[in-house]
Amino acid sequence: MERGLGTVAAVSDLGRRHHRNEDSFSVGNTALPDGTPAVVAVVCDGVSSSSRPHEASEAAALAAASFLLAALPRGMGGEQAMHEAVLVAAEAVNQLADAEREPGRNAPACTLVSAIAAGGQLTVGWIGDSRAYWVPLDRAGAARLTEDDSWAAQMVAAGLLTEAEAMADHRAHAITAWLGADAQDVEPHTATFQPDRPGVVVVCTDGLWNYAEGADQMARLVPDGSRSTPLPSAQRLVKHALDAGGHDNVTVALIPFPPPPSAQGRKGDA
């Protein structure tokens, strides 16, 4: 599954070890009230231990993107819009729960990561361990924009393990926050950045970042010319994950920053 709008692109692949793709994405263009282009990408990863994880990720991605594409033109600020979008996505996933149909099973659940590029700013929002990275055109100062909700991240934050030690543990990828009816109170993470140079935002599931965890590693993978060719570049990133083993579903969205003028006034999602 792939989608290219020129100003943003996303690709999702089954991987080599799974019989079903439980990832989903939604991307789109709109404009702020003053006509400034705004670009949105949402990527979700269904929790495999839950029931119907593919439905959860699809519902969350579509709900969050639809909210953002409607809220930004009305003048809602980026962080507020992102916060509300994650909550809207959470409610969409909650509505999938059906205890009578699936007794004893975990309710549908997924992670979510989203990015908005507009007005010289990048705003990201997330729940779970799907990630966003900033990769400048010159590759200098690449950065991870999100912090995982995971066992590994908790161990590192507590000073109990180094990142390398935590990631080597079999519990590393156990997530500590997600969207779903059996989740604790959902507290969306949001952050806003003001890059001082052009580049691209990489929004992805762990099916990609498992093979490029560090920001510098991710920066080396991003093809030259990604700002002008986001779809072929996203395809190459997915191919890298597949060539490296493809142990999971893999989904990546690329947003060129700043958004080109062609984003102005156009809308789209998938």
Model regions and ranges:
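PP2C/PPM-type serine/threonine phosphatase catalytic domain
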Residues: 1-270
